[in-house]
């Protein structure tokens, strides 16, 4: 990243742009120090960046930064509510093991299913395009796979 782009990114981050905050923290992590990078990462999460929220939850969960399991759970829940696909899987883990919440297998299953759907929606598109390409309207196996992810 050239100096001009770096300065523009920093100014955007300082003005409150949550996406710029996350991008700036990733830049700092690569080329400067982790402490300042994490400060900007936390700001991005608090400013509503879903990806930063999910990552912040993982930082806490794995002990890379201080925080409680309840805080990690809240980050995962908020990120999943904003549509961050990875957060659904992390939230499922919290429900499965009771990390930061009451253990709930049904909610864990729902989260994993949502995570699976997000992860595999490309597969659904590929299956549909393959059926169109081959002209297979009644292919039971492809229909079963597609239905699993819907």
Language-model regions, residue ranges each:
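Terminal, low-structured helical/coil segments at or just beyond the last alpha-helical repeat
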Residues: 1, 116-150
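Alpha-helical tetratricopeptide repeat
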Residues: 6, 10, 17-23, 54-56, ...
């Amino acid at each position: 990243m050239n100096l001009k782009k770096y300065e523009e990114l920093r100014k955007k981050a300082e003005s409150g742009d949550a996406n710029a905050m996350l991008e700036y923290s990733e830049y700092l992590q690569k080329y400067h120090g982790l402490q300042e990078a994490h400060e900007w990462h936390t700001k991005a999460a608090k400013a509503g960046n879903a990806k930063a929220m999910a990552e912040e939850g993982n930082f806490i969960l794995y002990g890379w930064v201080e925080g409680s399991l309840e805080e990690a759970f809240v980050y995962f829940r908020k990120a999943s509510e904003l549509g961050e696909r990875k957060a659904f899987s992390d939230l499922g883990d919290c429900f499965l093991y009771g990390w930061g919440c009451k253990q709930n297998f049904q909610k864990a299953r729902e989260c994993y299913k949502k995570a699976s759907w997000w992860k595999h929606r490309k597969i659904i598109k590929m299956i549909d395009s393959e059926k169109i390409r081959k002209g297979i309207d009644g292919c039971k196996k492809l229909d079963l796979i597609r239905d699993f992810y819907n």
